[in-house]
Amino acid sequence: MLTETEGRVAVKLARKTIETLLLGGRVPGPRDAGTDLPPVFGENRGVFVTLTEKGMLRGCIGHPYPDSTLEQAIIDSAISAAVRDPRFPPVGGEELESLIVEVTILTQPEKINAPPKELPDKVEIGKHGLIVKQGYCQGLLLPQVAPENEMDSIDFLGHTCMKAGLSPDAWAKGAEVYCFEGQIFKEKEPEGEVIEEKF
């Protein structure tokens, strides 16, 4: 778990990365934050960066698994959310002052070992994010997606399957389901105070 101070640093690092990319015209690297980072940023963590503009999703990409340091994962995810999310055109520099930056720090995903009919009871809305895998297909939804969209556990499982390109009931037909938890830090308003969001 990150402290509130570390969470603020995470969001500021994500925003600084996007600003450097869009206004400086170059791909940022480690230490572009211009400050010494707390030790936790040297630990390997999964992370997602989410960008919203006027309440609408503008980009969301991340590292589901702890395959790089938190610092590098935030930098990579911030760049990807801003200019590589295939669902949206790249963010422009003029949008920076209207974007809200959110960083979700993930725990290691763990497979839910339960018969399909018991899976909905194993999913805790507001606590768990989900990954569904079947063959070459994989989909992920962050923990905040279910409460923000008023989903129950069956809806959440179905939407995660669809994110993977599978039928909504694939979870009941042998797809592997993994859960993880997320710690969410976000700006209350563009470039504003950073808070920890809990559901």
UniProtKB/Swiss-Prot annotation:
> Which Pfam families does the entry link to?
AMMECR1 (PF01871)
Q: What InterPro entries does the record tag this protein with?
A: AMMECR1, AMMECR1_dom_sf, AMMECR1_domain, AMMECR1_N, AmmeMemoSam_A, Uncharacterised_MJ0810
User: Where do the AMMECR1 domain residues begin and end?
Assistant: 5-196
Q: List the disulfide bonds.
A: none
Among HAMAP family, the record links this protein to: AMMECR1
Q: Which PANTHER family match?
A: AMME SYNDROME CANDIDATE GENE 1 PROTEIN (PTHR13016:SF0), AMMECR1 HOMOLOG (PTHR13016)
- Name the chain's protein: Protein MA_3591
